[in-house]
Design a protein with these regions (language model features):
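Short, structured segments at the rim of ligand-binding sites
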Residues: 1-169
């Protein structure tokens, strides 16, 4: 029982009861393995301990990469990523609930030649850096000219001549 007196709060001694906590793996980090699977001609990658019952919003990456040619097979032990057929010609997605996945998705789409329009990206301009500008600045060096607005980023699928020896910063 807690006791208060003027500007003092007294809390009686108690016993510490340690408990085990299971910290689930990071789905944001898993997004890069999805990207590798999407870019590879063939892929089968196992990521242990990832669950489709995750509390993390970025677990949506499994569904977001399906149209990019990566299927997710869940088991008790984790998830197996497999290369599958890409079936879309334009990728449109609202990423307002998972804006941190935009960088991985944008680069993947460019490298596989898939035009896209991602919306819900307004928070990316106020992260540790302006991530929208960073994507534009680095991908133009590889020949991908991205078009941005306050809330979206898109690429029409057209490439320009990249720098002869681009320096990615």
């Amino acid at each position: 029982e807690t006791h208060r007196s003027n500007n003092t709060i007294r809390i009686p001694a108690g016993r510490y009861c340690p408990k085990q906590f299971r910290i689930e793996p990071d789905w944001s980090a898993a997004s890069y393995w999805y990207e590798i699977a999407a870019l590879a001609p063939e892929a089968e990658i196992f990521l242990p301990n990832l669950s489709n019952k995750s509390l993390q919003g970025d677990a949506r990456i499994a569904a977001l990469f399906e149209p990019l040619g990566v299927s997710s097979l869940f088991s008790q032990e984790g998830i197996k990523l497999r290369k599958s057929d890409k079936t879309i010609s334009l990728y449109e997605q609202d990423l307002s609930e998972q804006p941190d996945l935009a960088q991985t998705l944008v680069v993947t789409c460019c490298l596989i030649g898939l035009p896209f329009k991602f919306t819900g990206l307004q928070t990316l301009k106020i992260k540790e850096t302006d991530r929208i500008s960073a994507l534009q600045n680095e991908l133009i060096k590889l020949g991908y000219k991205l078009i941005s607005s306050d809330k979206s980023l898109e690429w029409d699928g057209e490439s320009i001549t990249p720098k002869v020896a681009p320096v990615i910063e």
